[in-house]
Amino acid sequence: MFEITRPPGVRAHVGVIGGSGLYDPGIVENPVEVKVSTPYGNPSDFIVVGDVAGVKVAFLPRHGRGHRIPPHAINYRANIWALKALGVKWVISVSAVGSLREDYRPGDFVVPDQFIDMTKNRRHYTFYDGPVTVHVSMADPFCEDLRQRLIDSGRRLGYTVHERGTYVCIEGPRFSTRAESRVWKDVFKADIIGMTLVPEINLACEAQLCYATLAMVTDYDVWADRPVTAEEVERVMISNVERARRMLYDVIPKLAGEPELERCSCCRALDTAAI
């Protein structure tokens, strides 16, 4: 159902999708830029394939280098397809988020376990537009195995890592109104807010990839009666990004093997999804 032609001679095992602030593929050694063609057009940028402690890693800046693609205009299907085409099994998505809780502070990390989709149906949510259709289960949308590895990595490094959280994904590119922010916080009971998780996570599930998000808290959303500015977000992001790099260096060598089937069902996501 998901037929992929891999670029000759290039393979990767772990994919890293860099979000706001993490555009630099300098996390890998022996980097090679790879252009991957997909049925859905071009990914956000060239994919840089290289090594981290002997593990082949494919790095893709979600917004393109220089942050030139806004959240609603990202070609999510091409991005996920391209990583799958390179042979990737694990995908670590790094994202900047706002906090909807006092105890999730700027500078903290969150490894979310749930999401709420508040995008506006302007994005492409599936690879299966017909005649084949699938209905993947999203009851527990993130790879629990990969989530736990990220949590363990953050703790080894002494960082504040919140091991659960509900991510509400809004359309963007604007930030929330104060009324909206209070709805996400008080009515939806969400914990963090961002603009890029959906449909990236849906597509990763359809591609049967192990996917988890490392969310970097950059600000309290405007429920806290403080306006959010791009300058504020960028200031916190600079310090967060270096710590995110250290987490990637720590966790990627531990992903050298295949996903463990007893801990993860991601590679079987389509087994019962077709009707």
UniProtKB/Swiss-Prot annotation:
SUPFAM superfamilies: Purine and uridine phosphorylases
Record PROSITE patterns: PNP_MTAP_2 (PS01240)
Disulfide linkage: 143-210, 205-266, 264-267
EC number, as in UniProt: 2.4.2.28
Entry keyword set: Disulfide bond, Glycosyltransferase, Purine salvage, Transferase
GO function terms (MF aspect): S-methyl-5-thioadenosine phosphorylase activity
Site (Important for substrate specificity): 176, 230
The keyword Disulfide bond is annotated on this UniProt entry: yes
Reactions mediated catalytically: S-methyl-5'-thioadenosine + phosphate = 5-(methylsulfanyl)-alpha-D-ribose 1-phosphate + adenine
Superkingdom, taxonomy of origin: Archaea
Protein function: Catalyzes the reversible phosphorylation of S-methyl-5'-thioadenosine (MTA) to adenine and 5-methylthioribose-1-phosphate. Involved in the breakdown of MTA, a major by-product of polyamine biosynthesis. Responsible for the first step in the methionine salvage pathway after MTA has been generated from S-adenosylmethionine. Has broad substrate specificity with 6-aminopurine nucleosides as preferred substrates.
NCBIfam families, A to Z: MTAP, PRK08564.1
Family matches, as PANTHER family: S-METHYL-5'-THIOADENOSINE PHOSPHORYLASE (PTHR42679:SF3)
Protein name: S-methyl-5'-thioadenosine phosphorylase
Gene source species: Aeropyrum pernix (strain ATCC 700893 / DSM 11879 / JCM 9820 / NBRC 100138 / K1)
